Swiss-Prot record:
It catalyses: a steroid + 2 reduced [adrenodoxin] + O2 + 2 H(+) = an 11beta-hydroxysteroid + 2 oxidized [adrenodoxin] + H2O; 11-deoxycortisol + 2 reduced [adrenodoxin] + O2 + 2 H(+) = cortisol + 2 oxidized [adrenodoxin] + H2O; 21-hydroxyprogesterone + 2 reduced [adrenodoxin] + O2 + 2 H(+) = corticosterone + 2 oxidized [adrenodoxin] + H2O; 21-hydroxyprogesterone + 2 reduced [adrenodoxin] + O2 + 2 H(+) = 18-hydroxy-11-deoxycorticosterone + 2 oxidized [adrenodoxin] + H2O. Transmembrane segments: none annotated. Its main location: mitochondrion. It comes from Cavia porcellus (Guinea pig). This is Cytochrome P450 11B1, mitochondrial. Pathway: Steroid biosynthesis; glucocorticoid biosynthesis; Steroid hormone biosynthesis. It is found in: Mitochondrion inner membrane. Its cofactor is heme.
Length: 500
């Protein structure tokens, strides 16, 4: 195997493919470009809208939604329509359709409200943050937040903090391995990775460490993690039904949902108040996103709390899943893993001296993360309400339609990705086409925490792979369920051995 450093990393030799996987294709629609076809002739998902609402009502979960949508694309082609209640939806899955959506985007890209989260904020008379807002108020909040969360300067400030947490995690894992009599450690990594993402999020937002890597994390820290888990679990149970139905059908889920948000709300308020008191005592240096927002003084306190709650909820599972699945894929693709380890070891001195060069120094590792997100997207789809008519796949889509861009089906489409069943990071070094890496969205409404998430994942994998060989006896594909975000139904055990 040949290996070159920097941006022209090259791998020669065979790539190990996913065991048991099969190629998944989508029948293409070949419509004449001479005339645009009316909305009514778009292939339609079977079943009327009342039946679909009753189905959501009857079922306790929607675990296979990604598989159902994928099968529908295979049967009907790259575009289809359906109604859920009173909402008219068009589903697409090709990069060209994302490009058209982006080109037609208004200054205020409009997304569907997440009903359970909206219900909590309204009932508690709290402000909405950027995740839930639409229109000019969304843009105003976003402009206040972007310089402190998304900008290159913001990431430059946050990167040393994330690096500290990633190094501490690797060191804590090393201590666990050394304490093992076998000289290696086999474990379910989900809980530990979850602790890592919560630790990073809390440190970046509030400038405080939670101490989650120790033997006895505080009960307050564990309660915070449980509250985050409860929000996501109950969101899935409630999001598909109108409040008028779910209030009496799923009253226990509403109770758990509100209790979890109450804890997160109180947690955020206490941390914001503590930071305010620190700044009042003259601690004016940069040490967190909240501190910087306060020093600038542009964001009203109620709006700050609302946005911090959004950032807290959105910053954990979005990185935990890709980290776990990257470790799993590297465990069953040892040739790829070794190439990444060589890259990390060769570039460690440069990264240590200048952490800002992280992405430039680790192109293959970044490609591996993109490949993981292609195969295992955290979000099932991106969505936009059309503010003006648009043509997609030669069909007229009227204004007011909700368009779903399905990431799972795009990533599994052989017309978009050659041999999509193969875990092949190299494809991202060779292919520079846009609108294929969409895990963090697109346009002005892309994920506000994407750059923080990117360095969080890069630094975690960089430090872990330098220190450990990762193995697994589990060679089957991991099954996933849709639970507001994509989640594995069970986690494969991973074995960590110190690098000799």
């Amino acid at each position: 195997m040949a290996f070159r450093l920097k941006s022209d990393v090259r791998l020669a030799g065979s790539w190990l493919c996913l065991r048991g996987a099969r190629a998944l294709g989508t029948r293409a629609v070949t419509a004449s470009k001479a005339s645009v076809l009316p909305f009514e002739v778009i292939p339609q998902h079977q079943g009327n809208k009342r039946q679909r609402v009753l189905q959501f009502w009857k079922e306790q979960n929607h675990d296979d939604l990604h598989l159902e949508m994928h099968q529908t694309f295979q049967e009907l082609g790259p575009i289809f329509r359906c109604d859920v209640g009173s909402t008219r939806i068009v589903a697409v899955m090709l990069p060209e359709d994302c490009a058209r959506l982006h080109q037609a985007e208004s200054p205020y890209p409009h997304r569907m409200h997440l009903e359970p989260w909206m219900a909590y904020r309204e009932h508690r008379r709290q402000n909405l943050g950027v995740f839930l807002l639409n229109g000019p108020e969304w843009l105003s909040n976003r402009r206040w937040l972007n310089p402190n969360v998304l900008s290159p300067k913001a990431v430059q400030n946050l990167l040393p903090m994330v690096d500290t947490v990633a190094r501490d995690f690797s060191e804590a894992l090393k201590q666990k391995v050394l304490q093992s009599a076998q000289g290696s450690l086999t474990m379910d990594m989900q809980p530990d990775i979850h602790k890592y993402t919560v630790e990073v999020s809390n440190f970046a937002l509030f400038g405080e460490r939670l101490g989650l890597f120790g033997c006895n994390p505080s009960s307050q820290s564990l309660k915070f993690i449980h509250a985050l888990e409860a929000v996501f679990k109950t969101t899935t149970q409630l999001m598909f039904l109108p409040r008028s139905l779910s209030r009496w059908m799923r009253s226990q889920a509403w109770k758990e949902h509100f209790e979890a948000w109450d804890y997160i709300s109180e947690y955020a308020e206490n941390r914001i108040q503590k930071k305010y008191e620190e700044l009042a005592r003259g601690c004016s240096q940069y040490n967190s996103i909240v501190a910087n927002l306060m020093l600038q003084g542009n964001l009203p306190l109620r709006a700050m709390k609302a946005n911090i709650m959004d950032l807290v909820a959105g910053s954990v599972d979005t990185t935990a899943l890709p980290l776990m699945m990257t470790l799993f894929e590297l465990a069953r693709n040892p040739t790829v893993q070794q190439a990444l380890r060589q890259e990390s070891m060769a570039t460690e001195p440069n990264i240590y001296e200048n952490p800002q060069r992280l992405r430039m120094e680790l192109p293959l590792l970044w490609a591996a993360i993109k490949e993981t997100l292609r195969m295992y997207p955290v979000g099932l789809f991106l969505e936009r309400f059309l503010t003006s008519p648009l043509v997609l796949q030669n069909y007229h889509i009227p204004a007011g339609t909700l368009v779903h861009l399905n990431l799972y089906s795009m990533g599994r489409n052989p017309e978009v990705f050659l041999s999509p069943e193969h875990y092949n990071p190299q494809r991202w070094l060779e292919n520079k086409e846009t609108y294929k890496h969409l895990a963090f969205g697109f346009g002005v409404r892309q994920c506000i925490g994407r750059r923080l998430a990117e360095v969080e994942m890069l630094l975690f994998l960089h430090h872990v792979l330098k220190s450990f060989c990762v193995e697994t006896a589990f060679q089957e594909d991991v099954k996933f369920a849709y639970r507001f975000v994509m989640m594995p139904t069970s986690a494969p055990l991973l074995t960590f051995r110190p690098v000799s």
